[in-house]
Amino acid sequence: MSAQRFEYKVVYADLRGRVSVEGDETLIEEGERMTAFGRRYLNSLGVQGWELAGIQHQPMGAAFHVFKRPLAEGQQPEPAKPIKTEPKP
């Protein structure tokens, strides 16, 4: 029997109501409370099997949230998205 393996997702969140994961942003809806926004976002990750594993606080109230979920035997983690760069003229 092999040891349990995990994949990880790093989520950046700030006090303006913005969540960013590898360039994909989710914004707070007009009139939505911050706590409701946080719960909505966390529940969407929970449905996908992600569990909060840690938080790294940043200046100005921002933070990196690290989530993990188990990998099935033989499954590989999702690859990270490449950084989009503009072609140089």
Label the predicted regions.
Residues M1-P89:
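Terminus-proximal functional modules
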